Amino acid sequence: MTVTLIIAALYLALAGAYLLVVPAALYLYLQKRWYVASSWERAFMYFLVFFFFPGLLLLAPLLNFRPRSRQIPA
C-alpha cells in the first residue's frame, strides 16, 4: 500500500464518520434525551446539531422521528 492510498482511505473514513456515523448516533441521542434534558445538555445538543448539520441534512429524508404521542388521562 502506498502512502497516498492510506491517506485517501483515512479521508474517506473520516468523511464517512462525519457525514453518516456520528449524525446517525446523534439522531438516536436526541430522540432519547430531547424531552428530559437539562439546560446545559440542551445547549450541548444545539452545538452538536450545528456542528454535524451537513450529515443531519443527508440523513433527514431517510429518518422521520415524530414527537411522542401524549397520554391524556380520561
UniProtKB/Swiss-Prot annotation:
Compartments it resides in: Cellular thylakoid membrane
Transmembrane domains' residue ranges: 5-25, 43-63
Main localization, broad class: membrane
The protein's assembly and partners: NDH-1 can be composed of about 15 different subunits; different subcomplexes with different compositions have been identified which probably have different functions.
Organism: Synechococcus elongatus (strain ATCC 33912 / PCC 7942 / FACHB-805)
GO CC, alphabetical: plasma membrane-derived thylakoid membrane
Catalytic activity: a plastoquinone + NADH + (n+1) H(+)(in) = a plastoquinol + NAD(+) + n H(+)(out); a plastoquinone + NADPH + (n+1) H(+)(in) = a plastoquinol + NADP(+) + n H(+)(out)
EC number: 7.1.1.-
Pfam families: NdhL
Listed name of the protein: NAD(P)H-quinone oxidoreductase subunit L
GO function term, MF aspect, one: oxidoreductase activity, acting on NAD(P)H, quinone or similar compound as acceptor
Membrane topology category: Multi-pass membrane protein
Superkingdom assignment: Bacteria
Protein purpose: NDH-1 shuttles electrons from an unknown electron donor, via FMN and iron-sulfur (Fe-S) centers, to quinones in the respiratory and/or the photosynthetic chain. The immediate electron acceptor for the enzyme in this species is believed to be plastoquinone. Couples the redox reaction to proton translocation, and thus conserves the redox energy in a proton gradient. Cyanobacterial NDH-1 also plays a role in inorganic carbon-concentration.
Lineage per the UniProt record: Bacteria, Bacillati, Cyanobacteriota, Cyanophyceae, Synechococcales
Protein family membership: Belongs to the complex I NdhL subunit family.
